[in-house]
Amino acid sequence: MTNDNLYRYLFEGVSVRGELVQLGNTYQQIIASKEYPAPVQKLLGELLVATSLLTATLKFEGSITVQLQGDGPVRLAVINGDHEQKMRGVARWEGEVPTDGTIHDVIGKGHLVITITPTKGDRYQGVVGLEGDTLAESLEGYFANSEQLKTRIILRTGEFEGNAKAAGMLLQILPDGQGQEGDFEHLEQLTETVKDEELFGLDAQDVLYRLYHQEEVKLFDPQSVEFHCGCSRERSASAICSIERIEVEKIIADEGKVSLHCDYCGTSYDFDSIDVAALHENAAKNDRDQVH
């Protein structure tokens, strides 16, 4: 199992749907951007898996952002993904982060914020308190409150064969499945038996067979998941041009350059006085060309 993929599946004769996501490279790139403490890496991995699972529920082109905000050691942890399963994320923390604490120990008094932004249409934002002791329990509460659909979410992170891995599953009763709670609970019990090493090391087909070999499962083609930051030197140059030139020149006079750092991938873009002069010269030329 080497690729980062999201899988969707259905159960024949039962109005329950499932998702399985298995991530390696995507997770590794996100946690490599900073020297995150182990508990923060774990939290980002769970958020990453959760965002991938939630993004798969979008029925339109757009993006979804899942973030945790609080007054604890980790003030912010956020993952952004889109309908193409392109992911990026970052976290901010202060001091020592508890290794074996609950989500309340890590985030403190806080909220789970889910923002859905369609390419066309209005943005939607849902804010819920942190329920239970884990991120998964808070997400299950979100679905119970916002969609009134019984949902079970499993989020796992860890190391497998020397590499950081993140994986998870979502099980949800379909809108027309009300009254089939018994079937859902049966499948829920089966899903909860999944082991970390199975999620991290087996192909999706093998994971599903081990869990549901007595059920009829329809597995759909996978969708690849990847890290995608979106930053570039060109975007950084545009940002510099939007700042008063005298302020930029003062920074260069003090530090020899102006630097823009991308929190998502860790890349720094440096501009010296010659670069800045060229940027403004090109901007002025473009303005003249538009006038004529």
From Swiss-Prot:
Gene Ontology MF term list: protein folding chaperone; unfolded protein binding
CDD domains per record: Hsp33
Keyword NADP carried by entry: no
Keywords: Chaperone, Cytoplasm, Disulfide bond, Redox-active center, Zinc
Claim: tRNA processing is one of the keywords in the record: no
Domain of life: Bacteria
Subcellular location field: Cytoplasm
PTM comment: Under oxidizing conditions two disulfide bonds are formed involving the reactive cysteines. Under reducing conditions zinc is bound to the reactive cysteines and the protein is inactive.
GO biological process annotation, one example: protein refolding
InterPro entries, A to Z: Heat_shock_Hsp33 (IPR000397), Heat_shock_Hsp33_C (IPR016154), Heat_shock_Hsp33_N (IPR016153), Hsp33_helix_hairpin_bin_dom_sf (IPR023212)
Record family assignment: Belongs to the HSP33 family.
Function per UniProt: Redox regulated molecular chaperone. Protects both thermally unfolding and oxidatively damaged proteins from irreversible aggregation. Plays an important role in the bacterial defense system toward oxidative stress.
Record-given protein name: 33 kDa chaperonin
Organism: Photobacterium profundum (strain SS9)
Phylogenetic placement of the source organism: Bacteria, Pseudomonadati, Pseudomonadota, Gammaproteobacteria, Vibrionales
